[in-house]
Amino acid sequence: MGLIAFSAVLTLTTCSHKSTESADTFNQSTTQTIETGNIKRKKDTENNALEWLGVPYAQAERWQAPKEVDKWDDTFDATEYGEKDIQFSNNEVVGSENELNLDIVRPDTDETDLPVLVFLHGGNNQTGHAQEIKGNTLANDLNAVYVSVNYRLGALGFNPLDALKTGSDEENSGNFALLDIAQALDWVEKNIETFGGNKDNVTLAGFSAGGRDVMATLISPTFKGKYDKAISFSGGMTLSDEEESQEIFATAIAPLVVEDGLQPTEEDAKNWLLEDNNEIADYLKNLSADRLAPFMGNAGIRLSVFPHLYKDGTVIPEEGFETETFNDVPLMLVTGTNEFSLFIASDERFAEDFNSGDLFQDEQKQAEFDYSRNYGGQLYRLSNGVDSARKLAGKYNSDIYISEIFYGDDSNVTPQLASTLGAFHGIFKAMLQTPSNYAAFIGEEFDNDGAKDMSSDFKAYLKNFLASGNPNDKNLVNWPKWSEQSKVLSISATENAKDIKAATDSETASDILEKMQADTTLSEGVKNELNTTVLSGRWFSAPLDEIYSSQEEQVVKN
């Protein structure tokens, strides 16, 4: 772990874990006491919030299961954000290895027994950090204790190679990031009452990769009883085959083996890495983290480049989401309607022209961008929401609520957004965090009265769900439970008023594929090129991939 900052100041007033449990009010003193020692907080007077930042919840050796943190003697200074876990971001390696810390934010009130929201950041399980949503304003909006978690990423958070399987069955799963998340939830169970949270009312939520992690925990025996409700923001059901993943990892690491003179060719190196012996494990564990962090950095939401969430048979069942056994809790699924737009804007085919603005001056380029954005977005929307619910149908007993955010798609209301990104991947965050970390994208599009009312209601739904597992109350448009009638909540706004209503989304991937086939805005050749190079292999594109895989098999047979 990274260095832990301590304060030598003696604690005059503390609130022990035991005393908080029996107290009727929360002790707002500067220092609290958790299982591992005293901890000093920060006060955000502007947002009326209390923060404990960079708090270590676990320690771990490389590719081993996390363990509880050692107790400390002095007072831990939790007034500064902790280091993020090592990652390759913006073409450079940042962060430190095994930075297993979390942030806690709560309203600056004396209330206790507050709902707890544990949040997992996005970033393809390769990048990102706990400050994706800081919680300073959100904790008060939801009247909850907000916990945001840093966990291991990339090839250090997931690694399926046999040579590393020297521990328990859970440790041998290769799903180290999931083990970190489980450990964070254990920490919450043991310590959250100290911060006025209710350990028996915990909601696990995540965005993007974090949302996919949440979905994976629903079928994981490791997470049984660790939380009470779940929210997946833009996160569908994605898992990886363990043997296929080993091949991909060995191929990715092979150049380092050759560079270090252990094998003469990359093919030899790959075959060597697929063996199971201590020499390989020792080599991998002694590699610099700076050399491992950039691996598979070009994944672009493709599991075929960076496979993770392995169906190992212990942490994740071999049958994946076909299992009959779930951690059956109330579930909320939230998606935008143009989920693929951000990824298209950064795709090598479009990125330069998108950033310069040339794309929007070229009719052909604009048509190619629109085709990829629109159909990719529709497939992605289904994957995040109704398609996930359909896979659970008949096996999952708890209530499922699905919302689809349309705000950003109407050129009469949000002209800049509608012409570029629309209701993009993560647009919900603009409703939850002030100031928004998407300010460069949204400009002033959320400053009108309609967007403000929409955002207020969205937070009210979340607040209700955290409290009871039901997002509804008498002051809100009824959010229907999803069923085989495909009921969802449509969320949008005009400039002057919110536009929130119950709706039906019965569309299927087959319907979208038929639209793509019938689309005449581009030639068949260009469409095929976009389908196979831009849209294929993504988290959401399995229905499209099946078509081209079948065509390739037919060509081989002929």
Labelled PLM ranges:
Residues 13-174, 443-454, 469-473, 506, ...:
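Non-catalytic accessory segments of hydrolases
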Residues 108-113, 163-179, 183-205:
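Gly/Ser-rich "nucleophile elbow"/oxyanion-hole loop immediately N-terminal to the catalytic nucleophile
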Residues 45, 394-558:
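Mobile gating loops/cap/lid regions near enzyme active sites that modulate substrate access
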